[in-house]
């Protein structure tokens, strides 16, 4: 259990510490995606609040700059935290499972600069 909790704590701490020039702060990204952590780690049903958070990010990130900022925040966190490939696959599948189309993949190799 500690192997799961420590990376999640680091994930959340790095989200709070990371800033963005876009109108949507990394703190806002964290607040919207925080309800998804339980699903990614433990599985089960996806909480409504998780899908709602993904929808809110999609609606709030209207400009290319906003979308790139959200992408960079997610990518930065994923790149700095030790995680299992299973967690990454679950996280990457969330937008589709919530019926939300994001202009980028939740993946450490995503090129956020290419988002329009």
Curated annotation (Swiss-Prot):
Pfam family, one: Tryp_alpha_amyl
Record PROSITE patterns: PLANT_LTP
Disulfide bonds listed in the record: 26-73, 36-50, 51-98, 71-112
Top-level taxon of origin: Eukaryota
Keyword Oxidoreductase: no
Signal peptide (UniProt feature, chain positions): 1-22
GO MF annotation terms: lipid binding
SMART domains documented for this protein: AAI
GO biological process: lipid transport
Keyword set, alphabetical order: Disulfide bond, Lipid-binding, Signal, Transport
Keyword Transport part of the UniProt annotation: yes
InterPro entries: Bifun_inhib/LTP/seed_sf, Bifunc_inhib/LTP/seed_store, Plant_nsLTP
Main function: Plant non-specific lipid-transfer proteins transfer phospholipids as well as galactolipids across membranes. May play a role in wax or cutin deposition in the cell walls of expanding epidermal cells and certain secretory tissues.
Protein family according to the UniProt entry: Belongs to the plant LTP family.
Name used for this protein in its record: Non-specific lipid-transfer protein 10
Organism of this sequence: Arabidopsis thaliana (Mouse-ear cress)
């Amino acid at each position: 259990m500690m192997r799961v909790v420590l990376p999640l704590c680091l994930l959340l701490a790095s989200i709070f510490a990371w800033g963005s020039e876009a109108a949507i702060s990394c703190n806002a990204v964290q607040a919207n995606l925080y309800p998804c952590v339980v699903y990614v780690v433990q599985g089960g049903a996806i909480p409504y609040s998780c899908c709602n958070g993904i929808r809110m990010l999609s609606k709030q990130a209207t400009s290319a700059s906003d979308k790139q900022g959200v992408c960079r925040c997610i990518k930065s966190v994923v790149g700095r935290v030790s995680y299992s490939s299973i967690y990454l696959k679950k996280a990457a599948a969330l937008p589709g499972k919530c019926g939300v189309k994001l202009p980028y993949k939740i993946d450490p190799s995503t090129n956020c600069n290419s988002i329009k």
